[in-house]
Amino acid sequence: MDTQPLIIRPRAEDVEGQPILRPLPSAKCRSVGPFVFFDHMLETVYPTGKGMNIRQHPHIGLSTLTYLFQGQIQHKDSLGSDQVVGAGDVSWMTAGSAIAHVERTPEPLWDQSFTMHGLQIWLASPKDHEQGPGHYSHHSAATLPVSDNLGVQIRMIAGSGFCLESPVPVLSPTLYAEVKMQTATTLLIPTEHEERAVYVLSGDAQLNGETIEPHALVVLPAGEEMSLFAESDVHAVVFGGAPLDGPRRINWNFVASDPVAIDEARRKWTAGEWPTVPGEVERIELPR
């Protein structure tokens, strides 16, 4: 068992012109609880006439969760969902055995300058849900539970912890919380979830007395209560959950415990044997 925090520095990526930082997956750590993929969409100002347009693409064996601090995204999928997701909302999509979706800037925002900033993560589905049906749900900011005590605000995005429980229909024990801390406040991170991590979005923080650089992901040692101290105003997320029920392979947009499922998904997407998003023609082809 690791007794020291594991520090992961993210790599910089670009998704359709949106700069991101991606600490998971990494060579040091493939997952934290059910979390197998973590993208921080950096705060980006789009000028008039510019925006995101991620064409339809497939997924299996995972749930995606989009959570924005600023901006909006329109979500459309092969189940027929069509939803504008605003700041503070949760967009939750479970892929099951096959789903396709589109993510783009809503039309009204193309006529003005706007700012995008948020997180998109993937959670691997438990083995008994990998081949299940797809599902989509939208949860407005007002439905997410919040605690505000002694200068520390916690919003439970998904799962449970800190005496809060989100309405998002997670498939395994999960912790995913947004934390805002005023200067000189402290947050105790309990041990109720076996695997936990902290990602500092902004601000100067210490974990058990050790400085955490902004944009570093810190995987916490199991079974040890940790103390997060804000040297300045801090914005962070705390996440984790129960360990995965076995290793997962990630290939492009596919996650599976069985490599055969990934091979079949690749074949079906290439052959056009995949559910499509109503009204959408353009798609992202399988990388060579």
What are these regions (language model features)?
Residues M1-R288:
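Jelly-roll (double-stranded beta-helix
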